[in-house]
Amino acid sequence: MPLPEPSEQEGESVKAGQEPSPKPGTDVIPAAPRKPREFSKLVLLTASDQDEDGVGSKPQEVHCVLSLEMAGPATLASTLQILPVEEQGGVVQPALEMPEQKCSKLDAAAPQSLEFLRTPFGGRLLVLESFLYKQEKAVGDKVYWKCRQHAELGCRGRAITRGLRATVMRGHCHAPDEQGLEARRQREKLPSLALPEGLGEPQGPEGPGGRVEEPLEGVGPWQCPEEPEPTPGLVLSKPALEEEEAPRALSLLSLPPKKRSILGLGQARPLEFLRTCYGGSFLVHESFLYKREKAVGDKVYWTCRDHALHGCRSRAITQGQRVTVMRGHCHQPDMEGLEARRQQEKAVETLQAGQDGPGSQVDTLLRGVDSLLYRRGPGPLTLTRPRPRKRAKVEDQELPTQPEAPDEHQDMDADPGGPEFLKTPLGGSFLVYESFLYRREKAAGEKVYWTCRDQARMGCRSRAITQGRRVTVMRGHCHPPDLGGLEALRQREKRPNTAQRGSPGGPEFLKTPLGGSFLVYESFLYRREKAAGEKVYWTCRDQARMGCRSRAITQGRRVMVMRRHCHPPDLGGLEALRQREHFPNLAQWDSPDPLRPLEFLRTSLGGRFLVHESFLYRKEKAAGEKVYWMCRDQARLGCRSRAITQGHRIMVMRSHCHQPDLAGLEALRQRERLPTTAQQEDPEKIQVQLCFKTCSPESQQIYGDIKDVRLDGESQ
């Protein structure tokens, strides 16, 4: 109900037992200002000995909501007074017909609760005037917010919240996204997200027990992040316990997600994990498989298993028993594959537990289940088991004391070596399974992991694991088998001499113009790349120029070629290298005739040019006694000619693609001769010339002209 003004209180009489109000004209010294306390509600009691019809009745109580933050200083300084009963009739006595209307006027002045929406990461967004703000920082009781479109649109909108107050600092450079905001609000109203886990089904507007739950004051409509649904066995069965848990869960909603007690939300369903073929773990959530990405503290980050296959961007974060899914999936869950993995997990656990001995019914039914082949191709799911002969050999190794059956002898004769392996040209091994070739990746204990040989070339994701004589294939191939290449490897395996190619005297090598070595094999030239132990690795000489990917490996006198060439051999260049090899004077200059001294010319920057056959070379580098030169027109004309000098010897590597610049060479030679002519002149004459060149015109008139000085100098 409205309070009387201070001016009206001065003229009214006070209640017995209170000090009289000061008279008009008297100075009133207010008390020291105090920090106003925040009261959610003020209760005003009116004492009256009359009932509704004037007969005595109990005092009535009227609840009025006041926000002391919005009140003025006069209201805060004044004291709430209770008027005497005699004067209450027309002033203080509330109208019983409309108590709610008078209270609503005060409610309108009170600040409304701020609206918050949850983010997929468990945070919250502030909603002000249909704009979304994300939290930037918090200093004391102030929370600073910036526009959600700050990074995308460069919006500089800012807001500061303090309690229930919100202050907007800067305007926005864009219109509010009404549709996106409404979509977020609709998402907030989903029944599955209304309450945290462990509270059973949502109960609508009425709480447990039929009571209407009042909304929490000062708490926006943001909920906790998505939680896993509780199992039916964990739902509370007694209604009394549900009535006790519901208010506590509602009170937890007023806390930020990081400060909510996990114990207060009840126990969650344990997470489901499945083992990967590499010994890792898959997270199973809503029939989707997630593979582990990283762990930060107690949080583990997961990505969808089909991220690379379908480009799915779904992510999940686990913290203890809580799961938060960040984005939705762009595909349907693979129910058949998930069920196959679950069966495989159960079978492996049963076999490892060893509850039933070998040869029992369970062992017969689950034999080889750990080698299930899970094919993720476009066709239906196929589950196959290894051949009985492989299992029989494992039993022979594990139980050597048991007698062997005749059929087991036949199986061993049919497959005496287990899985088929072929040697690679580098000395490694290929696994052959169903006409597909697998390259060894790593070994962990008794297990050896293999990848498809065409993984890099065709992006095949098929994997295989061998454990003893057992083979487990993880994924199907995206290509048909290379029967021709497989047959070539088998033929090479049968004829080892073909792998040890080369002449009886060893491989042929030719010296490079720079002093290195070329490997010659089948008229192709290979450049040395690196050496590892006894093996030397070579690459095709035309790799950079023609993109040839052929490789060769030499080990002693053995030569192994990895890939074919994409070009014919350069017979002319090979013959030129062989001719140079036969004439050592071209490379070493060991002729008995005296060597002619090399010609050098100075550059304008103080360097040197090498002159050879009227061509100019610029110095590139020096290594020991050798100096390497490149053609001066390399940048201008793209000439690739090179030269090497060692003492007075010179060796040219490549020919020039242009004619020599005779005019430029002659100009450089003339410039080389000019300083010698100038040095032969009189030094005093040179100094006088330089002095007169730098003198002012007035000085030149006094001392004469430059020509006169030259004449005088010549006459002297």
UniProtKB/Swiss-Prot annotation:
Superkingdom, taxonomy of origin: Eukaryota
Residue intervals of every FLYWCH-type zinc finger in the record: 116-174, 273-331, 421-479, 509-567, 600-658
Protein's recorded name: FLYWCH-type zinc finger-containing protein 1
Residues modified as Phosphoserine: S21, S261, S371, S503, S591, S696
Induction behaviour: Up-regulated by ultraviolet (UV) light (at protein level).
Region (Disordered): 1-35, 191-231, 377-421
Record carries keyword Metal-binding: yes
UniProt entry tagged with the keyword rRNA-binding: no
Matches recorded under Pfam families: FLYWCH (PF04500), FLYWCH_N (PF15423), FLYWCH_u (PF16662)
Cellular localization per UniProt: Nucleus; Chromosome, Centromere
GO cellular component, one term: transcription regulator complex
Function: Transcription cofactor. Negatively regulates transcription activation by catenin beta-1 CTNNB1, perhaps acting by competing with TCF4 for CTNNB1 binding. May play a role in DNA-damage response signaling. Binds specifically to DNA sequences at peri-centromeric chromatin loci.
Annotated crosslink Glycyl lysine isopeptide (Lys-Gly) (interchain with G-Cter in SUMO2) location: K134, K393, K685
Main location: nucleus
Coiled coil: none
Subunit structure: Interacts with CTNNB1 (when unphosphorylated), perhaps preventing interaction of CTNNB1 with TCF4, and thereby regulating transcription activation; phosphorylation of CTNNB1 may inhibit the interaction.
GO biological process, alphabetically ordered: DNA damage response; negative regulation of transcription by RNA polymerase II
Alphabetized UniProt keyword annotations: Centromere, Chromosome, DNA damage, DNA-binding, Isopeptide bond, Metal-binding, Nucleus, Phosphoprotein, Repeat, Transcription, Transcription regulation, Ubl conjugation, Zinc, Zinc-finger
Residue ranges with Low complexity bias: 195-204
GO MF annotation terms: DNA binding; transcription coactivator binding; transcription corepressor activity; zinc ion binding
